[in-house]
Amino acid sequence: PGKNNVGAYINNIDLKKLDQNKKNEIKNTLNQFGVIFIKEQNLDPETYQNFAKSIGQPVVYPRLKGLDEKYPFINVIERKPSDKNLSFGSSWLHQDTSYLANDRPRYTMLMGKEIPIGQGNTIFSSGFNAYEKLPEKIKSQINDATGIFSSAGPIAVTRLEREKEMGIKSSESMEAEH
């Protein structure tokens, strides 16, 4: 298990050489802990996408083009030296694709390829654990609440820059209630 009851580390495993039992074990661990960390993999796109398919149904990210036609589920998220605005998710608490009304992915997979020194500071939290620690009075006040999730906001700026570079027509904000 990781720090603060969020996540688990899986060590001494090669994702390129897994049988279905090991894949199921990884998926069960992910479901139990919410986040898993598997280091030192350096997967090629084929292996990465196949692993994703082995633990769930990949969904095409609606805001960017996939790596190519063969790998529509893989997106390159990068921070360029010329970027002046906040990057995807940088400095803001967020939930990936929570602004989708339907077909929200169950999991998000990240793989760092080039992480500058002093970067790579993604932090994970558990809404389930936070809720469980609330006083009963607050729980009763929010139990029937509905959240409004939007793809707009300060962190959208870098995404809009990438859309422009890729020749993607600037996308409208997406919003959903859950």
What kind of region is each of these model predictions?
Residues 1-178:
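Non-heme Fe(II) oxygenase catalytic core, chiefly the N-lobe of the double-stranded beta-helix
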